[in-house]
Regions:
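Acidic/histidine-rich catalytic neighborhood
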Residues: 1-41
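C-terminal, non-catalytic "cap/extension" segments appended to globular domains
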Residues: 43-157
């Protein structure tokens, strides 16, 4: 989340609270999808299926610090390990935002050149993976540091 954009385009006296809440929600989703991926890897590893309700509840409850009922162990699944795609997208989102800020400044969102970069990057739809998109920008593939820094900065504010 770009704090400058939020401050410029959002009204109200509780912007810091909003940024903190949004960041905590994102952190929750990151932890949830990482836990889902871990569980799905275990589920599809060919192990004992009778252990999976307990594994599901244990993994998600540990990751999120709230109890998850065992009954959802087959409902809370995405096809083809799609949880991994979400995680990669969130990682790349932070990388891309960082790239645009480094290239155009803190108000990168305000420049037409930013839109041109984004149009060029995404004009082919889903032809490219996030790794290929990062490579096209000259970035390291799936670098977690921008995401860590964004979360840390937003929670310290």
């Amino acid at each position: 989340m770009n704090e400058n954009w939020v401050s410029e385009y959002t009204q109200g006296s509780r912007l810091e609270e909003y940024i903190r809440f949004s960041t905590l929600k994102k952190l929750y989703m990151l932890r949830r999808y990482a836990a889902k991926l871990l569980y799905e890897l275990q589920l599809h590893s060919g192990g004992d299926l009778s252990r999976m309700p307990r594994e599901y509840a244990s993994i998600l409850s540990y990751a999120l610090k709230i109890r998850h009922p065992e009954v959802y162990y087959l409902d809370d699944l995405d096809d083809c390990f799609y949880a991994a795609q979400y995680l990669k997208a969130w990682i790349f989102e932070a990388q891309l935002r960082n790239f645009l800020i480094q290239r155009f400044g803190e108000r990168a969102y305000a420049y037409p050149e930013t839109g041109e970069v984004l149009k060029e990057l995404f004009s082919r739809g889903q032809e490219y993976s996030v790794e290929e998109l990062a490579e096209r920008l000259g970035l390291a593939a799936l670098d977690l540091d921008p995401l860590y820094e964004e979360i840390d900065n937003n929670l310290r504010a």
